[in-house]
Every structure is written in C-alpha cells, then in structure tokens.
Amino acid sequence: MATDRYREHKALNPFFDVVMKGLKGLVEGEHYYDAIADDAQFEFLYRFPGWPAVIRGRENLIAAYSGYGNNIVLEKGDRLGVHHDKERGVVTLEYQVHGKAVKTGAAYDNRFVSIVTIKNRKIVRWRDYMDSLAAWQALTGK
C-alpha cells in the first residue's frame, strides 16, 4: 500500500503494491521504500541507456526512480508468484505490471522476476530481471 510520503513516485504504486503483497509478513515498513535497508544493493540485470547496473543505498534508489512517471505510468500489478527460501532469507517474486508509456502512448506490459534477500526484516539485496524488449517497445513505440 503506497503512502502520501512518496506521492512523487505514484506512477510506481502498482509495482509497490504487488511486491509488498509478495513480501507481506517478511519485511517491516508500510511502503516499499520503508522496507529497504539504508545500505541495500539493487542489481538490474538488463541494460537501458542512462540506467545503472547497480544502485547502492536506499536513498539512491529513491532518487533513481524519481523520474519514472515521466516515462511510464503503471496502472496495475498482478500475476504474483512467491517462492520463499526461509533458511537463506531469500524470496523470489514473479509478477507483471501494466501501464502506458507517456511519450508514445503505447501499452506497457512487462514481466519481472525479482530475487530479494531479507535480513532483520529489511530488504538488503534485490536482483531484478525483466522483459527488456517489452520496455523498449513501449518507450520507443517500435
């Protein structure tokens, strides 16, 4: 459930909601950003011009996502699958998000697999895989 504290990131609310549903009972924090450890590491195993392969730190992640709504506005997150390895503290989330690319008006439908490591009820590592072709087609209209 998204809160007003992060209203400038409202274009991502369906993402926040679907992943927090998948992490329910495993992390502390009402909002996705609140569930992230200050020194967490995020790895993005896809490449887009200007997007880093690794982001270190909660505040850096928040800053990186600050312009998301200029490019894509999400409308829905669904198809959630959750696989939890309790011994290792690792959760694999499979989900989809749907929305619209702002500049092209193209539909944006994407599938993700996120491998999340949790320690002390906070996200400490996030490895993200997605269908980069779906994103590229929505953003370029091609």
What kind of region is each of these model predictions?
Residues M1-A35, T140-G141:
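Short, low-complexity N-terminal intrinsically disordered segments enriched in polar/charged residues
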Residues G25-H31, Y46, Y108-N110:
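Generic detector of bulky aromatic hydrophobic side chains
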Residues F15-L26, P49-V54, G69-V73, E94-Q96:
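Short, mixed-charge, low-aromatic patches
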Residues D4, D17, Y46-G50, A101:
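Residue-level detector of alpha-helix boundaries and kinks
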Residues A2-R7, S66-K142:
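A beta-strand edge to alpha-helix "cap/lid" segment located at domain peripheries
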Residues H9, E30-G89:
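A solvent-exposed, acidic/Ser-Thr-rich amphipathic alpha-helical stretch
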